[in-house]
């Protein structure tokens, strides 16, 4: 099997602000959020502990976006699997602008880690099969009701026939 390449990003970090939820004209949710990842090291010359933080723009779509908007807050720790995408647009002054984002869509994963504002200890939202979402949870009776609601709304996600996959090899 020939591969066109791999575009996969895996991050674990903390949200820098509450997720921003918007809706597209077709009613599907979109969430924009920023995720901070940090690395620590000890400076060999001074012995001083150093830290470097990177900020990542994350965009979630569909059910993942709805759940992120409802349950994630500034400071929430989250695991993200998605793909890297660069967008280009013109600003109000006509200058070309670029931004690089991690897109979490069909095939992407979001897992909440260490939610300190409720009794949810871990929740996984995985939209790999495009027919609905799978949610694993621990210690959240109230969340069961949300799962039933989301499972009964499977028709809100894309059916496999709506997604056009091009399986042809480009040579």
UniProtKB/Swiss-Prot annotation:
A motif (Important for interaction with partner proteins) lies at residues 166-171. Residues 150-171 are annotated as: Disordered. Residues 55-61 bind DNA. The keyword Ubl conjugation does not apply. Keywords: DNA damage, DNA recombination, DNA repair, DNA replication, DNA-binding. GO terms for biological process: DNA recombination; DNA repair; DNA replication. Homotetramer. Plays an important role in DNA replication, recombination and repair. Binds to ssDNA and to an array of partner proteins to recruit them to their sites of action during DNA metabolism. This is Single-stranded DNA-binding protein. It comes from Buchnera aphidicola subsp. Acyrthosiphon pisum (strain APS).
